[in-house]
Amino acid sequence: MDLYAVWGNPITQSKSPLIQNKLAAQTHQTMEYIAKLGNLDSFEQQLLAFFEGGAKGCNITSPFKERAYQLADEYSQRAKLAEACNTLKKLDDGKLYADNTDGIGLVTDLQRLNWLHPNQRILILGAGGATKGVLLPLLQAQQNIVLANRTFSKAKELAERFQPYGNIQAASMDSIPLQTYDVVINATSAGLSGGTAPVDAEILKLGSAFYDMQYAKGTDTPFIALCKSLGLTNVSDGFGMLVAQAAHSFHLWRGVMPDFVAVYEQLK
């Protein structure tokens, strides 16, 4: 049976095996998908041994996306620009192909919500690894992006890297342009730890819809809770993005595109 896995550390919290096995059942694909704990010191050796043992592909989650990318022989454009991958596929010639389906997963989920239309203004909060993976597909969907980060230089470096692909400008968190935004996307770790609000409430009130790339089982993420406390109710967490990026990884491996919305509805 074809073997796939998700690699991360920690990994017990991962929903990927549940999601991928639902996608396989829906599309009548015979495969096994498991969770694997990556060793912080010897991840590269583990991953190469996994593929040498006959595995067909895997997903990569924190903190290994950049390290896995370095092991690949060939890359999609979106993985190359992100310098990170969440998906590896073993090609027929034995080479490893790296892709990053995070951004197309986000775009697909925004389409599910009917929040994505050409030539919108999108405000992204945070310029870390999560953001790197989503910028190209958003720009390819003809979105105008303001990328805000506490450290302006980090936002500026990322915006400059992606400027050839569309309209993107950098801002610091306290110099965000005062204009309306069709979607505000939280890509900071505020969703994980609680912590302080990533941005001033007055900026949030300029938004029409609010998307958190994090998700929390059975409760609101801190960012979603903050939005609701301000009376901003057009909100979504990132669980749909998680299912959609999984569906795009599945499509790369199996050549079949599942109905991700059906699986999302089952699991949410």
From Swiss-Prot:
Gene Ontology molecular function terms on file: NADP binding; shikimate 3-dehydrogenase (NADP+) activity
Active site positions: 65 (proton acceptor)
UniProt keyword NADP, yes or no: yes
Keyword Hydrolase assigned: no
Binding sites annotated in the UniProt record for shikimate: 14-16, 61, 86, 102, 215
Protein's job: Involved in the biosynthesis of the chorismate, which leads to the biosynthesis of aromatic amino acids. Catalyzes the reversible NADPH linked reduction of 3-dehydroshikimate (DHSA) to yield shikimate (SA).
Protein name: Shikimate dehydrogenase (NADP(+))
